[in-house]
């Protein structure tokens, strides 16, 4: 990179190109300190928050550098002044650098640790896999009893209909077993809306498949030449149909049941019969398949509607209640005498709260709006309640854990005072027993007058903490208790909304909410009064902000108050929710582009890929919100591209007209996000062709080709004259059909899962043979009894333990083996020992072939590896974190003057943070899948990825904290003067750009599987340099301020101000507001205090990000390796 050296001559040559970055450089301003001992000329007479920020941050950065023993690489006095470039601070590699064999050493060490902890892991596995399911079995049965009964009754009725010979013969003859197969695929343990949509989609898909097959049958026997080679026509028809169905199911998951029914009908009708002429066609099989499959769909729908129906309303309200409960648990942990010293327990409660709201509630709400529901609540009111809960949780998410505002002794004393006060008043006691309100909590004016005398041995830190405790501890304690009571009342009100006699409870709910609203606002007001009293007291000073623990207490107070204010909004939204309660049919309202790629939770589990699909969905959502952020103009300033171009051209001229235009320059954004747009060309057709080529070469098409090839290979014997007889006689076409039903493109699995699925299939085959082989060969009563015995354990395995595919395999195999000989017309031969055995082992072998191929197909030819996806996911996650950091730095920290974040900016920030949280959780689920993959070639250490994910989660929390604090202060107002701002521009650019650049490099290394470069910019050193010069400017300002005040001549001060203003105006730059001594008392001290507190919090968060990024870099080097010379 070309760089420019600072000109050291006294009269620089004006012809030397300095680059487009034409501001005064840092080094030239640094020389002014030696040329002018008074420092920089422009001064501010009011105290600046830069002193607190610089002192805290610089001390921490100095300690970090000292602990790491970094040695900075010499920059030889060069400085970068061009736009688009920055000066990176590099440090020499650690003397304990990784050797080329370090990966081998790490792997050997990991292997030794794994061997040493083998017994511990074995005991944990035994506990997880055996003892815990046994202990929790009664609870799981009670919780899922209704679902198990619905699954059981639907399947049992289907078997009973099939074994009754008149009904079974009318429904499907020897293919009647498609009735229970359809029940298994479309089981009734779903919401009514989902079941109805699934039924309609499957009916349309099966009808379309039968129509396609009828056309293929007609064409294949229309003439004698085609009838002689009917297999070729059916082969072509099946290939086209499978290509269409598999690709559509892979791209748009909403068509899962449509394509499944379509494919089943296509595979069945293309392999079940081979005719030599149109007179040999047996169209009866269309009836046999269509009616049995239709009755299975209708039976599942009937059981879903009649037996304990679920409309989706109760599940969503359960998510809301759970969210309120976890928030209450977190607040209770803050004032728990036993947990006050356990930061880990409080942190776990905080993480659970975030997960419940950002993941569980969000997932439940999406499922609710993505399906047909019969709801009692207005959708817009539910959405407002969810958004207000999210806003409340945002402040609690960054709440400092276990600050020194409380200790266990003080909490016990507060609880004793509370109980004593309640016991003294019988009236208040009755009210408290009737409704757990906080009206009995004693309050007093918590002013510093209650502050205890300070002993001579106390440190400054202890003095500050004691002063803050005396002022705020009881008010904060009362506010937390009140928030807990309010959350409990909200949970009670939501339960009353669901009760049948809701109209009678509505007045009571309004009374509870109104009382909670007034009490909470009163506690917030009392906390505000305590704060104002403290600000006006003698204990309030600038030195408080130089203590980190005091800043934590202020942030705790601020974030808690913000969350309490948001809780007031939650109360209002809950009250609005109860004003419009009546039964209504809510159609799906989810955006179509996203609805086509989503399925309800139970349907996703039925697919068999577990939570892996959640990762791809979350990744699409994150990409979508970043695309919206980068292509939406959120500035308060107007932006006109045409006028900007005209101004740029006119600026090249020197006439009077162009000068007038420059005087009326419009305000534009400092950074234009169009560079981040995915559309890199102005030609729309070129972009569309690129998208088409991506689709044709994507994973969906590769999977389609692979599955179609395997299906055609398994179907091939049915079209050959030498093999079609035995293939159709023993229903061997169940091999391709089983393979199609069990294969999934996002399921890698391992040999243990293959064996588990195979064992379940063998159990089903054996049980079906036993049902027919028992006394009175093929007795309908025995078959029904065996069906009832096998469906109970596998329904529990299906619904409780989420082993959906293995349970489906067992029940499908039992259904086919039990009903195939029972349904054949020649009962005298088929229902004998020889007939039952031959039918069992031949058809069972076909089923086993389909089962064995269903999982290893993902291991060969364009395989799906969760480990590869995990590496790609880390690349995307690091890129998204880097872009989030850049967005916070651009739109919050270094925003233009008078360009505060808008409501749209805040909305995008909330959506981005929630979706990144969901993406992190989805990556953790992907890591669980990667742990169970078979190790073939590469070594994989999941603990390294787990450490990297934890570091990324910490980075996200700090980015959120910085975003919240960045909205409350302007960085330009904290500078001493405009020349300080110009001098620090390059250092601020270097500090932020170093972090973004490291994110970019790490992301690309994960995507390309390259090793991490040995030399990367050190953000900590860049940030240390920034605060070093901020401290220097602060010292220069203090020195100049003391020299100016020592003169005692007001005329000299006014003259200095005039000189400064004249200098600023002559330089052609806009002057920053310079507060005078006369009007400095008019500045709102409270606003300035919180501005400074948030500035310190922001600086600390960015310092934490720089430090955590070094840990991320170390984890990345452990995973990918490090380049060596």
Curated annotation (Swiss-Prot):
Compartments in which it is found: Membrane
Cytoplasmic side: 1-143, 195-198, 249-254, 306-706, 772-780, 865-1125
Keywords associated with the record: Glycoprotein, Membrane, Protein transport, Transmembrane, Transmembrane helix, Transport
Pfam families tied to this protein: BRE4 (PF10334)
Sugar-bearing residue positions: 830
Residues that span the membrane, as ranges: 144-164, 177-194, 199-219, 228-248, 255-275, 285-305, 707-727, 751-771, 781-801, 844-864
GO-annotated biological processes: endocytosis; protein transport
Superkingdom field: Eukaryota
Membrane-topology descriptor: Multi-pass membrane protein
Ranges of compositional bias, category Basic and acidic residues: 1-10
UniProt signal peptide: none
Spans annotated as Disordered: 1-21, 426-449
Keyword Glycoprotein (UniProt): yes
Principal subcellular localization: membrane
Record-annotated disulphide pairs: none
Keyword Transmembrane helix: yes
Record-level GO cellular component terms: cell periphery; membrane
Extracellular-side positions: 165-176, 220-227, 276-284, 728-750, 802-843
Further comment found in the protein's record: Deletion of the gene leads to brefeldin A-sensitivity.
Assigned protein family: Belongs to the BRE4 family.
Described function: May be involved in intracellular vesicle transport.
Protein name: Protein BRE4
Gene designation: BRE4
